[in-house]
Amino acid sequence: MAKKITGYIKLQVKAGEANPSPPVGPALGQRGVNIMEFCKAFNAQTQNVEKGLPLPVVITVYADRSFTFITKTPPASVLLKKALGLKSGSSKPNTDKVGTVTRAQLEEIAKMKMPDLTAADMDAAVRTIAGSATSMGLIVEGV
């Protein structure tokens, strides 16, 4: 018989840097999950990912206080900022442009994000990432 699910916890945790401090500790503690067990498992699973890259994680908590978790790919905005070497996007994306992104860069990011996107094909995924880039105040070339 399947375990009874008591809830889901969605967090963004930096790869290889999960520790019991906020936001991880309080979110897991109020559900009765063993915090250190999660931190060790998360850090072990993300050891091959670039350290410090924020990863969305969905933790499923069961009635017996056990858990499972699924890590997702980093947010598109983080990957775009990393690809262009930016600290942040534009505060006024419609008027102030902070950089230019090429189709090749968009395709590279779309390949990485493809498992988490609902896009039917690569072209749709590239357009999705291009939309994120435009919202950040980036000029999109070749789309």
UniProtKB/Swiss-Prot annotation:
InterPro entries noted in UniProt: Ribosomal_uL11, Ribosomal_uL11_bac-typ, Ribosomal_uL11_C, Ribosomal_uL11_C_sf, Ribosomal_uL11_CS, Ribosomal_uL11_N, Ribosomal_uL11_N_sf
SMART domains according to UniProt: RL11
PROSITE patterns: RIBOSOMAL_L11
PTM remark: One or more lysine residues are methylated.
A GO BP annotation: translation
GO cellular component, one term: cytosolic large ribosomal subunit
GO MF term list: large ribosomal subunit rRNA binding; structural constituent of ribosome
Alphabetical UniProt keywords: Methylation, Ribonucleoprotein, Ribosomal protein, RNA-binding, rRNA-binding
Biological role: Forms part of the ribosomal stalk which helps the ribosome interact with GTP-bound translation factors.
Assigned protein family: Belongs to the universal ribosomal protein uL11 family.
Assembly information from the UniProt record: Part of the ribosomal stalk of the 50S ribosomal subunit. Interacts with L10 and the large rRNA to form the base of the stalk. L10 forms an elongated spine to which L12 dimers bind in a sequential fashion forming a multimeric L10(L12)X complex.
Name of the protein in its database record: Large ribosomal subunit protein uL11
Organism, scientific name: Methylococcus capsulatus (strain ATCC 33009 / NCIMB 11132 / Bath)
Lineage: Bacteria, Pseudomonadati, Pseudomonadota, Gammaproteobacteria, Methylococcales
Encoding gene, per UniProt annotation: rplK
